[in-house]
Amino acid sequence: MDFETIDPTDFGTSLTGIGINLLVRDVQAETRFLTQVFQMQGHRISADFAIMQNLSQLLQLHSDGTYFSHSLLDLLPENPPRGAGCEIRLYHCDPDQAADKAEHAGGMVLQPPTDKPHGLRECYILCPDGYAWVPSLAIKS
C-alpha cells in the first residue's frame, strides 16, 4: 500500500484491529519527534494529518483543529500531558538510543533505560504533547 497516494476512503476502510489516533497541537513537530527519537516513518505529512509507521504498525496524528466540531476536543487539557494513564509501547525499539535522542528532540525521559523483570529493557519518554512512549527491547542474556 502506498501511503503517500492512497485515497482517504481506501485507507480508512483498509484499517483493521486496534487503531491509535493521537490529537496533537502540531502534527509536523510530532512527526519530527517520532522520526528522530523512534525512527518511525511519516507519510502524507501535512499541518493537519500524518500517517506514522512503526515496523508494520500504523498510527495517525491529527491536529486539534481537525476535531473542531468533535466533542473529544473539549476534553483535552490546555497543557500537556494529554495522554495521562496511557502508555504507547514500541517493541523492538532500542530504549537506550531513544533516550539519548529524546531531550534533543524536545521530549523528556521520565524513566531512563532499565532492565525489567518481564524480560524487557525499556524507558519512558514524554513527547512535547505529553504522551508516554515506551521503547523496549528484549534483554540480551
Sequence positions of predicted segments:
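Short, conserved clusters of charged catalytic residues that mark active-site
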Residues: 29, 44, 94
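Vicinal oxygen chelate
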Residues: 1-19, 40-90, 99-126, 137-141
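Conserved active-site tyrosine of GNAT-family acetyltransferases
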Residues: 30-35, 102, 130
